[in-house]
């Protein structure tokens, strides 16, 4: 009698090299790394550089240097090439086009000729957060109508989002129920300028790279519904997801790369890796004090915290004290 072996945990960190990492990026990377290492899994590094106007190889090299300084190593990725290369999304466009061809064959995508201005004129922001739901203006165009419109305007491509809820158990937030159609409508998978959209690229990459666990910021929680629908449309099994709280200042404003004191470049001049790790672990709630600690020491601490903490494991937002970057 044969027994099936559990699938090894395979996590990933997939930053965008648009600037120096800030504290929020570092917390995501740390939690993704700790979750994988606490399960004896593998870590993948992927560089999400689809936006040529903001992302450069130089910034990617700096990003990897910062991760290495903190000790957040990866088993596969740039510098550790294995079977899933290339690891820069800008070099994976043929894979995204292949996925689009598969979706086209099932009529799961369609051309959209709407401009941003036209959509703003007919839509209201969803839930007041600035997100617009696409009202389906081009969903039922005939081939002849689409051909006529394409003579004067290059279309984007949208995915036909099923009008049903996506449910999953978030590692940190607990049970989730997302209706993509009611929240976003049919979402873009390739922009009108030919750049593949985040939702498609990240889904294709996670599927082809064998990712089984994704830890990232809570701002991406709604996107999980879109990605899970794409996984199912492509006949793939989605990974397990965990979303961590957004970092905010005491006024409740979300931290950004403009917070210079919380930029990794500044933090590296003020702290050793062990000092910074201790402060981050204290901020996230699994160390009582912001004391120096190594990654090796943090793994069992995280494991105990995860086992003993109820769900949700974090508050929705995490307030960064004013003196975080003061030694």
Q: Which residues make up each language-model segment?
A:
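Short, mixed-charge aromatic SLiMs
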Residues: 51-61, 249-251, 300-309
């Amino acid at each position: 009698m044969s027994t099936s072996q559990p699938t090894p945990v395979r996590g990933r960190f997939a930053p965008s090299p648009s600037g120096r990492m800030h504290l929020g990026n570092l917390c995501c990377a740390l939690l993704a790394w700790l979750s994988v290492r606490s399960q004896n899994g593998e870590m993948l590094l992927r560089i999400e550089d689809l936006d040529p106007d903001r992302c450069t190889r130089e910034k990617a090299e700096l990003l990897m240097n910062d991760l290495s300084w903190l000790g957040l190593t990866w088993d596969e990725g740039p510098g550790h090439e294995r079977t899933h290369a290339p690891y820069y999304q800008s070099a994976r466009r043929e894979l995204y086009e292949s996925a689009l061809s598969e979706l086209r064959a099932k009529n799961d995508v369609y051309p959209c000729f709407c401009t941003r201005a036209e959509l703003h004129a007919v839509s209201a922001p969803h839930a007041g957060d600035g997100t617009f739901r696409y009202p389906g203006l081009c969903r039922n165009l005939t081939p002849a109508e689409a051909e006529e419109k394409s003579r004067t305007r290059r279309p984007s491509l949208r995915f036909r989002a099923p009008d049903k809820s996506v449910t999953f158990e978030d590692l940190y937030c607990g049970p989730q129920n997302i209706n993509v159609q009611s929240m976003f409508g049919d979402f873009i998978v390739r922009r009108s300028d030919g750049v593949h959209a985040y939702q498609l690229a990240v889904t294709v990459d996670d599927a082809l790279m064998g990712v089984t666990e994704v830890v990232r910021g809570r701002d991406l929680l709604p996107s999980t519904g879109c990605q899970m629908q794409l996984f199912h449309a492509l006949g793939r099994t989605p990974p397990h997801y965990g979303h961590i709280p957004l970092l905010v200042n005491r006024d409740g404003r979300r931290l950004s790369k403009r917070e210079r004191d919380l930029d990794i470049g500044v933090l590296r001049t003020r702290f050793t890796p062990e000092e910074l790790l201790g402060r981050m672990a204290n901020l996230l709630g699994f160390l009582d004090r912001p004391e120096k600690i190594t990654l090796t020491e943090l793994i069992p601490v995280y494991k105990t915290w995860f086992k003993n903490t109820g769900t949700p494991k974090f508050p929705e937002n995490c307030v960064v004290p004013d003196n975080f970057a003061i030694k």
